Amino acid sequence: MAFCISYVGALLPCSLSTRTKFAICHNTSKLHRAAYKTSRWNIPGDVGSTPPPSKLHQALCLNEHSLSCMAELPMDYEGKIKETRHLLHLKGENDPIESLIFVDATLRLGVNHHFQKEIEEILRKSYATMKSPIICEYHTLHEVSLFFRLMRQHGRYVSADVFNNFKGESGRFKEELKRDTRGLVELYEAAQLSFEGERILDEAENFSRQILHGNLAGMEDNLRRSVGNKLRYPFHTSIARFTGRNYDDDLGGMYEWGKTLRELALMDLQVERSVYQEELLQVSKWWNELGLYKKLNLARNRPFEFYTWSMVILADYINLSEQRVELTKSVAFIYLIDDIFDVYGTLDELIIFTEAVNKWDYSATDTLPENMKMCCMTLLDTINGTSQKIYEKHGYNPIDSLKTTWKSLCSAFLVEAKWSASGSLPSANEYLENEKVSSGVYVVLVHLFCLMGLGGTSRGSIELNDTQELMSSIAIIFRLWNDLGSAKNEHQNGKDGSYLNCYKKEHINLTAAQAHEHALELVAIEWKRLNKESFNLNHDSVSSFKQAALNLARMVPLMYSYDHNQRGPVLEEYVKFMLSD
């Protein structure tokens, strides 16, 4: 009698739509797909397949009018940057607290890259005068919380003890704070920067969240919407451009510089849209010329989806166009190889495929089926080409580091295939150790690290090994959220290879809700570790990489906000916002 189990294939972080289950039977050697759900994004240019570049060009509204508008933009654009810089400088000189609010606004609206020098000077002055808990005693909850968050975000240590000033004799936060909505919101935001062991920040998060949730019903509509958005998407753990749309409304007419800053943010968005649209055309052209989706007709043919990852990860650095396009190629191959392991290969073929990647040897693919052989050889060609581009741009060849990530990824996929063939679930710890590799996070971040010119021989350059703990935390966050999203949206029957079911196998009396809560607790722990690792990587050369890596983790709440049709309307809305009017 054949023994069959239902198994969820490697749920890559790139799986923006819900993955389907695969039935693996012991009396066959193939992995059979039940049915891949097509992409349900209702986004211009994404129809679940690859439109030719000319059609994609039309779908993205790149017409003569929009291009002519772009040609006229720079004159006003530069003037608006200068005007904003002047206003920021004035506030930095005359109003320490409002200058911090101004800095926060530039971050939330995604225009801070224009004012790095001015922002650094404001933060330097503020840190010199406010870092002492004694001095913080004379400031409001909102002011101290904002100061704390901005300093930690920018690598300046402030003790969590500054919040002791807001506790009463009972050791609990003071009762009068319950009426300070603005202060509580900022306290909640500040608590997202906590490290492991900072109990007072755990208390601050719980206190502020409970009070704000309890008060939502009695708030006016605009305030309720604003507070609700911040509770759902705290700034530190979310994508700035996504949360910035709501913050634009929050600014209102409170500050005289608000209108100027909003106008600059809109101009910035126009520039970014133009760049992203052009990059998507490049990606579509590359994908069509590659032609692998024609050989692997069951594989996911979603270049738009591939590109979305690079667009969001590098959303803060519009100048890194080449890096976004090149990184998208790596994302595409994670999808393809995942599909090779989930759909095409027998276990014996998957072993040969993995050995070929491990050897990085074209001839080792000779015994593979033609479609698998073509995929493997094209992977080697593409990554060798990426390494050559990095060498030409930055003066060093990272091929060994890049090869290592692909070897590890394929080996992790192979472990999954063997687990599936055995019909048994691994322990929760075994699962998580392997799945954080099969998530694809290491591949993406190592490629990004090298594409940004890090890890070379230049003096003072950070080493790739210095980022391993940071990458590990991001990979675990993704894997756990991926499994949580799958559990919610795929109606798992308890026999699939998710962390939740591996954990429940070891704790047989645990309910699904308790297992879910346990996974969320692990996510919270990894965010604390990620905060600490990010803070410790306080080196000028790595700041852009660090921000991009955090953006990878920040995609999680966008990815797993599914509706009843298993679409991701929140992410869909964000991508539409970034690509079209």
Curated annotation (Swiss-Prot):
State the Gene Ontology terms under molecular function.
magnesium ion binding; myrcene synthase activity; terpene synthase activity; tricyclene synthase activity
Q: Which residues bind Mg(2+) 1?
A: 338, 342
Does this entry carry the keyword Lyase?
yes
Its EC number is 4.2.3.105, 4.2.3.15
- Cofactor(s) demanded: Mg(2+); Mn(2+)
Q: Which reaction does it catalyse?
A: (2E)-geranyl diphosphate = tricyclene + diphosphate; (2E)-geranyl diphosphate = beta-myrcene + diphosphate
The organelle transit peptide extends over 1-68
User: InterPro entries, from UniProt?
Assistant: Isoprenoid_synthase_dom_sf (IPR008949), Terpene_cyclase-like_1_C (IPR034741), Terpene_synth_N (IPR001906), Terpene_synth_N_sf (IPR036965), Terpene_synthase-like (IPR050148), Terpene_synthase_metal-bd (IPR005630), Terpenoid_cyclase/PrenylTrfase (IPR008930)
Positions of glycan attachment? 27, 206, 319, 384, 465, 509
From which domain of life does this come? Eukaryota
Binding sites annotated in the UniProt record for Mg(2+) 3: 482, 486, 490
Q: What class of enzyme is it?
A: lyase
Record carries keyword Metal-binding:
yes
Found, by tissue, as follows: Accumulates in flowers; mostly expressed in both upper and lower petal lobes, and, to a lower extent, in tube and stamens.
Cofactor stoichiometry and binding remark: Binds 3 Mg(2+) or Mn(2+) ions per subunit.
Might you name a Gene Ontology BP term for this protein? circadian rhythm
- Which residues does Mg(2+) 2 bind? 338, 342
Named in its record, the pathway it takes part in is: Secondary metabolite biosynthesis; terpenoid biosynthesis
Where would one find coiled-coil regions in this protein?
none
- Membership in a protein family: Belongs to the terpene synthase family. Tpsg subfamily.
Q: Which PANTHER family match?
A: OS04G0344100 PROTEIN-RELATED, S-(+)-LINALOOL SYNTHASE, CHLOROPLASTIC
According to its record, what is known about the domains?
Answer: The Asp-Asp-Xaa-Xaa-Asp/Glu (DDXXD/E) motif is important for the catalytic activity, presumably through binding to Mg(2+).
Q: What does this protein do?
A: Contributes to floral scent emission.
* Name used for this protein in its record: Tricyclene synthase Oc15, chloroplastic
The record lists the organism as: Antirrhinum majus (Garden snapdragon)
Please name the gene that encodes this protein.
Oc15
